[in-house]
Regions:
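Receiver (REC) domain switch/active-site residues of two-component response regulators
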Residues: 31
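Ligand-binding pocket scaffold of soluble enzyme catalytic domains
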Residues: 34-36
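Basic phosphate/pyrophosphate-binding loop/patch that engages nucleotide-derived ligands
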Residues: 113-119
Length: 137
C-alpha cells in the first residue's frame, strides 16, 4: 500500500500559512508528498521553507497560475488537479496549507487505509476536525 500526500500553494509564507507544519504532520505515513508551488511574489520564501523539510518524499512541482483562464477561485481546483496527477499512491491524502493532522491519529489512519485498501465500496475516509480562529491582537 502506498499513500500520497498532496497540497498546493503560492505566497504561503507571506500569507502566514503553516505549510511546513502542515506537510510534516502527515509526512510520516506518506510514501510521497506532492506540493504544487505556484510562482509567487519576489519577496515570498515558500520554496525555501519547502526545501528546509529536506525529505526525499517531498516532490515540488513548479507551476504558473492563470487566473484569467481559471477565475473566481477555480485556479485552486486546477492546482489541486495538477497535484493529483503527480500522485502515485493507492490512497491520496489532501492536506491544505492551513491544516495539520494530529500525530496521535497517524497510526489509525494508516491502519484503516491498509484495512480498506481492497474494499471497492470505500471511496474515501471522512475526518472530524476542529477550526481555530485568532489573530495577533
Amino acid at each position: 500500500m502506498k499513500i500520497s500526500g498532496f497540497s498546493f500553494g503560492r505566497n504561503t509564507s507571506k500569507l502566514y500559512y503553516p505549510i511546513k507544519e502542515s506537510i510534516l504532520s502527515i509526512l510520516p505515513i506518506c510514501d510521497e508528498f506532492i506540493f504544487v508551488l505556484g510562482k509567487g511574489d519576489d519577496d515570498d520564501n515558500t520554496l525555501e521553507i519547502l526545501e528546509s523539510i529536506d525529505s526525499p518524499k517531498l516532490k515540488i512541482i513548479h507551476t504558473e497560475w492563470d487566473t484569467e483562464k481559471y477565475p473566481n477561485g477555480t485556479e485552486n481546483a486546477h492546482q489541486t488537479d495538477i497535484a493529483i496527477s503527480h500522485c502515485t499512491g493507492d490512497w491520496l491524502f489532501y492536506v491544505q496549507a492551513d491544516e495539520v493532522v494530529h500525530e496521535k491519529y497517524l497510526d489509525l489512519i494508516k491502519s484503516r487505509c491498509q484495512e480498506l485498501l481492497t474494499n471497492d465500496a470505500v471511496e474515501g475516509l471522512l475526518f472530524k476536525y476542529r477550526h481555530f480562529f485568532g489573530d495577533y491582537n
